UniProtKB/Swiss-Prot annotation:
Disulfide bonds: none annotated. HAMAP family: Leu_tRNA_synth_B. GO terms for molecular function: aminoacyl-tRNA deacylase activity; ATP binding; leucine-tRNA ligase activity. It is found in: Cytoplasm. This is Leucine--tRNA ligase. It comes from Moorella thermoacetica (strain ATCC 39073 / JCM 9320). Its main location: cytoplasm. The keyword GTP-binding does not apply. It comes from the Bacteria. ATP binds at K585.
Length: 829
């Protein structure tokens, strides 16, 4: 071994060897238990950031440990490669999106190789490659065939200045992030997936995921937003129109003093046409188009409304109820109409107070009256129904069911379950995405592209114009085609799919990435799925994870996969911070992984990122912490180097010859136990590394305190080999070199994970704490497992204890074996 730890030579050397030997390539093996370890694949932005390093280092430790424990491990990597930044590069730099993307992929692949992550690169996928998006398109057609894909008008974010559609992420404080023009809502024909058909299953099956963090499951529950209640039908006075309203509180129906419609509600125009209210209402509707859904529903946002001049009839008491429009009601939720019950809903109360609308109490506390004129806030607790006709005196919870039954009996309502979850809008007016494989024919209508004609290839040389339509619209060789049914002239769909569609099935493609005739091979999917451990940021808790679950359930129903949940266990790692803030260019606090690797090596970077904090917590970057990890690896290098030649030459069988031998042997097995449990059961990589550091300290202690001629080289060889094996998943390059130095022939990563010996953990001696009247006075070494009577005898006969007890009478002696003795004494009378 070289005297100096030279990571600049060691790391590239072993990366080349791993690649040449296909060390991490994997195939199906029915004789081994399988383990599918997956980190969320990245968008190829061009460079890895520290969040990537953390994510992939965590996954790599899990994958490497599982391999060493005898599992057949699938650990793939790929690229979520479609998306808006590539189009921005085309617009601002004149670089074609494909060229920009593939260049970024090449650079990030190089950086991942430099990190030493144990990926099976033979399974690499990129969602922008025709071999991949051909099957994304095929899956869209399966959704369409089964009635889960459909087209309808929907509102999108529209920037009038750029004349383009914006994604939600591009709307900042209600304005376009590029030009700061206020963004408005505009209706366009869009494609949707019917994810709401799966709302109940998506909700219920969260119970089947004990390996997911509770916070993620709660976020999904809230996003699905299941609520039970009633749909109440209000008739519009003087017309045949009806307004269905969903409410979770039918018990408050007698307290309705107004109705509110969303500004986009189709009835608004009908109700106001030709009336004095038409102009002001139209102005209000236009103003609402410049507010995002988030702005309109924010609790701190002022609620604005306007009377339409129309009235509805309350079905339970036939009272006239004024119909308003308001900015806080969304067409996307429920029916786009809500009933105003100001006495029992705080938002309604504030709206009624602002516009001087009546307040009618219909629920009072069980033990007191509740005059409407004295209300300072809405009464939202349970109570007794009042002013509610035949339901007076009922507990309101009972009234919910009774009022619903009454509505059903008169044909003016029904029990209903509502969801916050909306169908998934997948259309994007973008170029750099998977083209939606549909054709429009004047004779035949909407026609799917035949499966044998896939993929619908993205054309090159497209012009990017800020028109609000996909750039594909202005590419006649793409748009103009023939109808597959009648052979007449037809037009291709020019929208592309939301990039979340591509990432909703990539974990299936990894199981058979080279398949030419299908999206994935069923036998291989059945072997590898579910993903045993999925790792990624909590920011993906809702959209990506929800969509992937939906896709898997739909494909299961189509008979294409055998599982209903894609990810058995989920780890959401925290962010990497610097100076207390998330790393970002704007804050000037970015630390480049490449710079750290060039200065300290990949093993140091990995070790620090795993050691600095538990994975689920945010990690504060520390230059001193990186230096400390680098010094530790140098200590390990020197330790192994100082023994390598001697332990290779040492012969004979292992014997424990001294107390020092016994302590080192015990420490080794305690470390194996601790590291195994921390990595496999708790993902406490930081405490696992800490235990390895303690073992290194123990080895140095042995080296420093045991005379050289008395040192047990067979034992030290065994300890160092186990030490290197334990460290290997965390620091894979240096451990290969150390393993070779200790005489290893194969890769250390082919070694079996060490097993601890329970008998080796038994301590020969323990330190016994001695208390007198509960206060620690002394300590002594005694043989482990000593009987209570013997412990009591040794303590009471100890000189220091006898002196402390002089003049006192021993009342009793409390013995906690192998831990402490408490002598209870009082002054002798």
């Amino acid at each position: 071994m070289e005297a100096r730890y030279n990571f600049k030579e060691i790391e590239p050397k072993w990366q080349r060897r791993w690649e040449a030997s296909d060390l991490y390539r994997v195939t199906e093996d029915p004789d081994k238990p399988k383990f599918y370890c997956l980190e969320m694949f990245p968008y190829p932005s061009g460079n890895l950031h520290m969040g990537h390093v953390r994510n992939y280092s965590i996954g790599d430790v899990v994958a490497r440990v599982k391999r060493m424990r005898g599992y057949n491990v699938l650990h793939p990597m790929g690229w979520d490669a479609f998306g808006l930044p590539a189009e921005n590069a085309a617009i601002h730099r004149g670089i074609p999106p494909a060229e920009w993307t593939w260049s970024n992929i090449a650079n990030m692949r190089r950086q991942l190789h430099a990190m030493g992550i144990s990926y099976d690169w033979d399974r690499e996928v990129a969602t922008c490659h025709p071999n991949y998006y051909r099957w994304t398109q095929w899956l869209f057609l399966q959704m369409y065939k089964h009635g889960l894909a459909y087209r309808k008008k929907a509102a999108v974010n529209w920037c009038p200045s750029c004349a383009t559609v914006l994604a939600n992420e591009q709307v900042v404080d209600g304005a376009c992030e590029r030009c700061h023009t206020p963004v408005m809502r505009k209706d366009l024909e869009q494609w949707f997936f019917r994810i709401t058909d799966y709302a109940d299953r998506l909700l219920e099956d969260l119970k089947k995921l004990p390996g997911w963090p509770d916070k993620v499951k709660i976020m999904q529950e809230n996003w699905i937003g299941k609520s039970s209640g009633a749909e109440v039908v209000f008739r519009v006075e003087g017309s045949g129109e009806e307004i269905p309203v969903f409410t979770t509180r039918p018990d408050t129906l007698y307290g309705v003093t107004y109705l509110v419609l969303a500004p986009e509600h189709p009835l608004v125009e009908k109700l106001t046409a030709g009336t004095p209210y038409e102009g002001p209402v139209e102005e209000f509707v236009q103003a609402a188009r410049y507010l995002s859904a988030l702005d309109r529903t924010a609790t701190e946002k002022e609620k604005e409304g306007l009377f339409t001049g129309a009235y509805a009839i309350n079905p339970v008491n036939n009272e006239r109820v004024p119909i308003w429009i308001a900015n806080y009601v969304l067409m996307e939720y429920g029916t786009g109409a809500v009933m105003g019950v100001p006495a029992h809903d705080q938002r309604d109360f504030e709206f009624a107070r602002k516009y001087d609308l009546p307040v009618k109490v219909v629920i009072r506390p069980a033990s007191s009256e509740l005059p409407a004129g004295e209300l300072a806030a809405a009464y939202v607790e349970d109570g007794i129904m009042v002013n509610s006709g035949p339901f007076n005196g009922l507990p309101n919870r009972e009234g919910i069911q009774k009022v619903t039954e009454y509505l059903e009996s008169i044909g003016r309502g029904r029990a209903r379950v509502n969801y916050r979850l909306r169908d998934w809008l997948i259309s994007r007016q973008r170029y750099w995405g998977a083209p939606i494989p549909m054709i429009y024919c004047d004779q035949c209508g909407i026609v799917p592209v035949p499966e044998e004609d896939l993929p619908v290839i993205l054309p090159e040389g497209v012009e990017f114009r800020p028109t609000g339509e996909s750039p594909l619209t202005y590419c006649p060789e793409f748009v103009n085609t023939t109808c597959p049914r009648c052979g007449g002239p037809a037009r291709r769909e020019t929208d592309t799919m939301d990039t979340f569609v591509c990432s909703s099935w990539y974990f299936l493609r990894y199981t058979s990435p080279h398949s030419q005739d299908r999206a994935f091979e069923r036998d291989k999917v059945d072997y590898w799925m579910n993903v045993d451990q999925y790792i990624g940021g909590v920011e993906h808790a809702i959209l990506h994870l929800m969509y992937a679950r939906f896709f898997t359930k739909a494909l299961h129903d189509f008979g294409l996969v055998g599982v209903e949940e894609p990810f058995q266990n989920l780890l959401t790692q925290g962010m990497v911070l610097k100076d207390g803030s998330k790393m970002s260019k704007s804050k000037g606090n970015i630390v480049s992984p490449e710079e750290i690797i060039n200065r300290y090596g990949a093993d140091t970077a990995r070790l620090f990122i795993l050691f600095a904090a538990p994975p689920e917590r945010d990690l504060e970057w520390s230059d001193q912490g990186v230096e400390g990890c680098y010094r530790f690896l140098n200590r390990v290098w020197r330790l192994v180097g100082s023994y390598a030649d001697a332990v290779r030459r040492a012969g004979g069988s292992l014997e424990i010859r001294s107390h020092a031998d016994r302590e080192l042997w015990r420490l080794l097995h305690a470390t194996i136990k601790k590291v195994t449990e921390d990595v496999e059961e708790r993902f406490n990589f930081n405490t696992a590394i800490s235990a390895i550091m303690e073992l290194v300290n123990g080895c140095y202690r042995y080296q420093d305190t045991v005379p050289e001629e008395e040192q047990n080289l067979v034992l030290m060889g065994e300890v160092l080999r186990k030490l290197v094996t334990l460290l290997a998943p965390f620091a894979p390059h240096i451990t290969e070199e150390l393993w070779q130095g200790l005489g290893g022939q194969e890769s250390v990563h082919r070694e079996s994970w060490p097993q601890y010996d329970p008998e080796a953990l038994v301590e020969e001696e323990i330190t016994l704490v001695i208390q007198i009247n509960g206060k620690v006075k002394d300590r002594m070494q005694v043989p482990a497992g000593l009987a209570r009577e013997k412990i009591e005898e040794l303590v009471l006969n100890r000189d220091k204890v006898a002196a402390l007890l002089a003049g006192q009478q021993v009342v009793k002696v409390i013995v906690v074996p192998d831990k402490l003795v408490n002598v209870v004494a009082r002054r002798a009378s």
